[in-house]
């Protein structure tokens, strides 16, 4: 289900709308966010493909899969930066990675971060799909707040060889 979760008036005419997609109803929630920065196109592409797959599972088109739990997806978090073709939206110059938990009354990027944070706060799992910097070789990896059996099982299921624990500060 596609749902508009935020609409911000802009100085350029049409409002900036933030959408989320949701599949499933109950169980642990997985939140997936992509498009935090305008130059991270790979994450948006992966999120789009995943959305198509989840649609086919929920609609029963692919009977080999069932959805256990709930998935929430923000495929395009920072549309202004994407439309400008740059990492940041030049109008406010804020890095969305650093804007969380956001401020609903703040700059546009802060308001977007606040809405995403609010709609993903109850998630057990959270993925941010992004790209490595240009000319940088990177392997798929997982950053986690804690290492436990569920994280180890997730890495095994996704065939991710590297999981790093984030130091809480």
Predicted segments, located by residue:
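Structured catalytic-domain cores with a bias toward divalent-metal coordination
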Residues: 1-169
């Amino acid at each position: 289900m596609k749902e508009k979760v935020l609409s911000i008036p802009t100085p350029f005419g049409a409002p900036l709308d933030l959408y989320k997609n949701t599949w499933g109803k109950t169980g642990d929630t997985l939140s997936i966010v992509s498009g935090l920065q305008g130059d991270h196109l790979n994450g948006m592409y992966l999120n789009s493909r995943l959305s198509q797959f989840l649609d086919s599972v929920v609609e029963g088109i692919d009977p080999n899969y069932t959805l256990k739990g709930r998935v929430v997806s923000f495929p395009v978090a920072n549309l202004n930066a994407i439309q400008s073709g740059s990492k940041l939206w030049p109008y406010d110059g804020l890095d969305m990675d650093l804007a969380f938990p956001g401020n609903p009354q703040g700059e546009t990027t802060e308001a977007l971060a606040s809405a995403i944070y609010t709609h993903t706060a109850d998630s057990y799992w959270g993925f941010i799909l992004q790209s490595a910097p240009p000319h940088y070789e990177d392997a798929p990896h997982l950053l986690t707040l804690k290492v436990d059996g569920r994280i180890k099982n997730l890495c095994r299921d996704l065939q991710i060889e590297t999981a790093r624990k984030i130091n809480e500060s």
